[in-house]
């Protein structure tokens, strides 16, 4: 066990984490040259295209160090984006050390700081590594000082490398061997294995990635999942090199996979503990905190025939992504679907994209919303993650909205424009510190403003240099109202949203004007209205198409023409009463994409 090293890499998007892991695999001969490709561990197409890591992956490599000994390095890859922080905490729970990889040209970013604190809280040894030192703009000394000032860990003598051209990679591996502590645990104790990740394989059933804390698990043995108490037999176990490599056993300190023919998707929940069926341990491994969804949206299939496939796809995804929440929902406008909970907007986009790509579904997503608290006059508190749960306006004493504390790191040239967008988003400044060339700005902002388009706006005003990390801190009363959309007097539930009263008229007008462009003209007039309660705040009309009923009258008496026109008018009136307006799917999609709450 003394030669095992479990570690993960903490790094911001684009700081070279995936490239560095490729180099580790190359140096340790994990794959042949022919099998090597860039970003080996980013196995999803979306990960490659967007250049981000979404899922945690693991690799076991044998490294012969300069002292002549062979070490088993278990490297657990982690995502860098703020929406996937849950994946990060899962990966860190299985490690003893973490490499803090920082781009020597760009410096420290906000999400790196947040993930680094998570690692420190879990008592991991954090080792700073300065990457991309081959760039002409690299300033390793300045960045090392930034690490010390912002994060507070000693970065003097930090290992430098360039993963892209392969300089210093062996030095990094030597640093891991020297500084990451060996795992603690007893090979002969009762089995305790923590499930770090699970995914569904069509041939093997559920595949679980586990970190064995104590004891040994062998092929053919029976184990049970502690939360459910169900026992299974091990069919295959082994490690990823990054290909699957079968072994006879996994012992304390090791990280590997277990296949036990589990067909039930919820058979091995992430964060659970496995133990022997015949000689179980009493207490599970302390897992990681259950994450609460922050953003909710309705998801519907365009054709209702795909509903069963949609449910199955969501179940398979939720096995692989423990932070996804869903429950059935019915919308009058969009039919049957699911109300889904996500960690943030990027998480929502990725889930939608994965459902569409991996499961060939066509989906519509309703406007995202956060969880509000409605306090009724009788004192009852209702958590509103869906507008249908909002009580009647007369019964509500106040609505409270979630407030997040956002920590923003930007170069000092952009401070003014960042403060401007924070004020526009109803933010309250808490703190502002200058650290070297960077400025750390802390604001309390309404969560709905942050999850809609704050990140994109921040990136554009800071030319891509701004970074953001946020966490929910409290609820506070706010003047929120429910904005309904009526078409010919009928409410369209899919387009309703909760907005701040000051912005309601502007949002209502914008929504109505956009719908006017998208709803095709009918044979009768279509009135589009935005309303708060019983008050109409905006209105627009799609004019009726008109058939020329006088075309067959050549000259002749004017009363004949009047009679035909009156008849047409009557017909239109009757049509308006009984005619229903078909709203095309494109109109929904276009409006929902643009609703920036």
From Swiss-Prot:
GO terms for biological process: positive regulation of translation. Residues 2-184 form the tr-type G domain. One of its GO terms (molecular function) is translation elongation factor activity. It is a peripheral membrane protein. Its EC number is 3.6.5.n1. Required for accurate and efficient protein synthesis under certain stress conditions. May act as a fidelity factor of the translation reaction, by catalyzing a one-codon backward translocation of tRNAs on improperly translocated ribosomes. Back-translocation proceeds from a post-translocation (POST) complex to a pre-translocation (PRE) complex, thus giving elongation factor G a second chance to translocate the tRNAs correctly. Binds to ribosomes in a GTP-dependent manner. NCBIfam families: lepA, small_GTP. This is Elongation factor 4.
